[in-house]
Amino acid sequence: SFSRKYFLEKFNSNPYLSDYNYINFDIESIDLIKDFIDDKDLGGLNVTIPYKIEVIEYLDEISDEAKEIGAVNTICFEDGKRIGYNTDIYGFKESLKASSINRIDSVVILGTGGASKTVIYFCKKNNIPYKILSRKKSKDCLSYKEINHSIFEGNVLIVNCTPIGTHPKINECPDIPY
């Protein structure tokens, strides 16, 4: 995960944070979260693909925004409670600002997991039309095979919410008509 390196650099560069550590818990199943979620030595957890939706059932509380989004990527341990938040929405908004994107006519969302729920939430809040694409067709989603170039016409923002293109699959890309 990119997060470990990022946070360790932050902790090591700040004398007030030098006692902190960041550990990856790579789990094969969400059920394995039980092995460490109640560890009193942990200050919190980050949640990544594919558990941002499934982790909700293990929490005591969830922020209103995370509830609306339907996905959690940050768990804080406060007063003996496991509280879930979604900070992906903040990161998504900030990445748009940093990219100087001024106009979005529509959004094409690749993938159907927790990250896609964040982008859907953003689109709904900003009245931006969107389409969801995935490998498999479903009620709310087109399959990659069903689309053509016309879906990408205009000021379309394409958001990859799949694990494809991230470590270790950095040279792969979703199967869409580029």
Pin down the residues of each PLM region:
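Glycine-rich adenosine-cofactor-binding loop
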Residues: 1, 84-89, 96-126, 134
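Phosphate/diphosphate ligand-binding glycine-rich loop within oxidoreductases
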Residues: 1-99
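Conserved beta-strand positions in the Rossmann-like core of class I SAM-dependent methyltransferases
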Residues: 23, 108, 131
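Short glycine-rich anion-binding loops that position phosphate/pyrophosphate groups of nucleotides
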Residues: 47-54, 114-115, 163-166
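NAD(P)-binding Rossmann-fold cofactor-contacting core
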Residues: 125-143
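Rossmann-like adenosine-cofactor binding region
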Residues: 140-178
